[in-house]
Amino acid sequence: MLPLLLGLLGPAACWALGPTPGPGSSELRSAFSAARTTPLEGTSEMAVTFDKVYVNIGGDFDVATGQFRCRVPGAYFFSFTAGKAPHKSLSVMLVRNRDEVQALAFDEQRRPGARRAASQSAMLQLDYGDTVWLRLHGAPQYALGAPGATFSGYLVYADADADAPARGPPAPPEPRSAFSAARTRSLVGSDAGPGPRHQPLAFDTEFVNIGGDFDAAAGVFRCRLPGAYFFSFTLGKLPRKTLSVKLMKNRDEVQAMIYDDGASRRREMQSQSVMLALRRGDAVWLLSHDHDGYGAYSNHGKYITFSGFLVYPDLAPAAPPGLGASELL
């Protein structure tokens, strides 16, 4: 079953699911991936429902309502992609429980015949009974195109009390490190003013910080457990500004980037993801081009997100540490 799941969810899911759980732990597995293949127009604030299910391990996703209901408390990674209908804007929110908006996918480009898509992802800490779903903005100028959307989620780390064995000696603690954060303020580059340039992109909202390895105010993740990590980030584009954001390792090692120099006055979004092998002390952060004409857009809907988590810890002896804080910038 696991190979089928990995094939259907794609590379990100393969990385995130990690090692196969041991005997007796099948009840702690929870993963889903679903798709909507038909358009949907906004007429009232509504949940996005789905007509195709690729994976539903644990049966925690209800395709008819479009809701995932948490059965195993823990940290979950969610990702979704929504297609935009021609002549319409796109606004799809990741919602927890009744009305807690966690992140947003948005595109207001309304050129005739334009078919586009926007993606978003976030890791959330869920309790038993929490629900997570997608909501399409209810105003008539918003709509999903065809194909409409995909929505996936999976348990990365079960809470410690959830995965404790019922019998036998306690298992050694599982190496864990994960974070997910958002920024609710836009960022505008400027050539004026004093102060250091090329600072990490800071965040003001923290969804998850397992292990305490991410400093939201500084915008830096520092590796505590050597191993393979998955990182994803999404940013909104300011109208008439160039979007240029790089995923950095340590001081000047560019790992991945997103870029859009379109002159449109409409707000749009871009996403990127990558897997990195990190040593203890390595720093990972986002760098926004800090000059006139550049910028990134966000608001309370949380357009800007940044997530990362340990997939596989190293089994070999630890390598020398990476850069210290004073050497990063």
UniProtKB/Swiss-Prot annotation:
The identity of this protein, by name, is Complement C1q tumor necrosis factor-related protein 4
Q: Which GO terms describe its biological process?
A: cell surface receptor signaling pathway via STAT; gene expression; positive regulation of interleukin-6 production; positive regulation of interleukin-6-mediated signaling pathway; positive regulation of non-canonical NF-kappaB signal transduction; positive regulation of tumor necrosis factor production; reduction of food intake in response to dietary excess
Spell out the Pfam families in the cross-references: C1q
Q: Extract the signal peptide range.
A: 1-16
Q: Please provide one cellular component term from the Gene Ontology annotations of this protein.
A: extracellular space
Q: Where is this region: Disordered?
A: 164-195
Question: InterPro entries, alphabetically?
Answer: C1q_dom (IPR001073), Cerebellin_Synaptic_Org (IPR050822), Tumour_necrosis_fac-like_dom (IPR008983)
**Where, by tissue, is this protein expressed?**
Widely expressed at low levels. Highest levels in adipocyte tissue and brain.
Repeat as a keyword? Answer: yes
The task this protein performs is described as: May be involved in the regulation of the inflammatory network. Its role as pro- or anti-inflammatory seems to be context dependent. Seems to have some role in regulating food intake and energy balance when administered in the brain. This effect is sustained over a two-day period, and it is accompanied by decreased expression of orexigenic neuropeptides in the hypothalamus 3 hours post-injection.
Effect in UniProt of substituting G301D: Found in a patient with autosomal recessive retinitis pigmentosa; uncertain significance
Specify the inducers: Up-regulated by IL6.
**Single GO molecular function:** cytokine activity
Question: Can the keyword Repressor be found in this entry's annotation?
Answer: no
What is the recorded phenotype of mutating H198Q? Found in a patient with systemic lupus erythematosus; uncertain significance; inhibits TNF-mediated NF-kB activation
Q: What is its main location?
A: secreted
Q: Where is the C1q domain?
A: 25-162, 172-317
Q: How does it assemble?
A: Homomultimer. Forms trimers, hexamers and high molecular weight oligomers.
Q: Which domain of life is it from?
A: Eukaryota
| Gene encoding the protein | C1QTNF4
| Compartmental location | Secreted
Q: Which UniProt keywords apply?
A: Cytokine, Repeat, Secreted, Signal
